[in-house]
Amino acid sequence: MVVIGFDPGTAITGYGILNKGEDGISIIEYGALTTPSGWGIGRRLNYLFDQVSSLLDLYNPDVVVMENIFFNKNIKTAINIGQAQGVIILAAEQHQKEISILTPLEVKLSVVGYGRATKNQIQYMVKEILKLKDIPKPDDVADALALCISYIYKQEGC
């Protein structure tokens, strides 16, 4: 099973692609889709749509995973995340991919085992679970990988 996770944003969208096979979880690819600060919102969202579509074409994942938008005190940030999430959902739908939206609590519980885990604890566990030398950067990438891990564990009943 190939799982692609996205941590959406209009400036930086982290992504991670994992494979769950008989030998466990393996990394296919991870990275960040970034847009220049001078681009308008329309251009940024169009670029994001094209890049997400390319990843879906290239890796043909079984499922697209994202985190449910949580309450954010900064309304502009929340709107930008929602716009990016909508573009990713549209790309997934056009590629006929299953879409799974996880809550922050689900991710924390499955990756760390503690519902009040910090961002640093989640990032550390991503590094350990995937046997990486370093924590993936930027943070958005580690978050996207955590979403993939959480989805896989959820499917296994962990």
From Swiss-Prot:
PROSITE patterns: RUVC. CDD domains: RuvC. Binds 2 Mg(2+) ion per subunit. Its main location: cytoplasm. Keywords: Cytoplasm, DNA damage, DNA recombination, DNA repair, DNA-binding, Endonuclease, Hydrolase, Magnesium, Metal-binding, Nuclease. GO terms for molecular function: crossover junction DNA endonuclease activity; DNA binding; magnesium ion binding. It comes from the Bacteria. Disulfide bonds: none annotated. It holds the Pfam family RuvC. One of its GO terms (cellular component) is Holliday junction resolvase complex. The active site is at residues 7, 67, 140. GO terms for biological process: DNA recombination; DNA repair. The keyword RNA-binding does not apply. SUPFAM superfamilies: Ribonuclease H-like. Mg(2+) 1 binds at residues 7, 140. It is found in: Cytoplasm. The RuvA-RuvB-RuvC complex processes Holliday junction (HJ) DNA during genetic recombination and DNA repair. Endonuclease that resolves HJ intermediates. Cleaves cruciform DNA by making single-stranded nicks across the HJ at symmetrical positions within the homologous arms, yielding a 5'-phosphate and a 3'-hydroxyl group; requires a central core of homology in the junction. The consensus cleavage sequence is 5'-(A/T)TT(C/G)-3'. Cleavage occurs on the 3'-side of the TT dinucleotide at the point of strand exchange. Homodimer which binds Holliday junction (HJ) DNA. The HJ becomes 2-fold symmetrical on binding to RuvC with unstacked arms; it has a different conformation from HJ DNA in complex with RuvA. In the full resolvosome a probable DNA-RuvA(4)-RuvB(12)-RuvC(2) complex forms which resolves the HJ. Belongs to the RuvC family. This is Crossover junction endodeoxyribonuclease RuvC. It comes from Dictyoglomus turgidum (strain DSM 6724 / Z-1310).
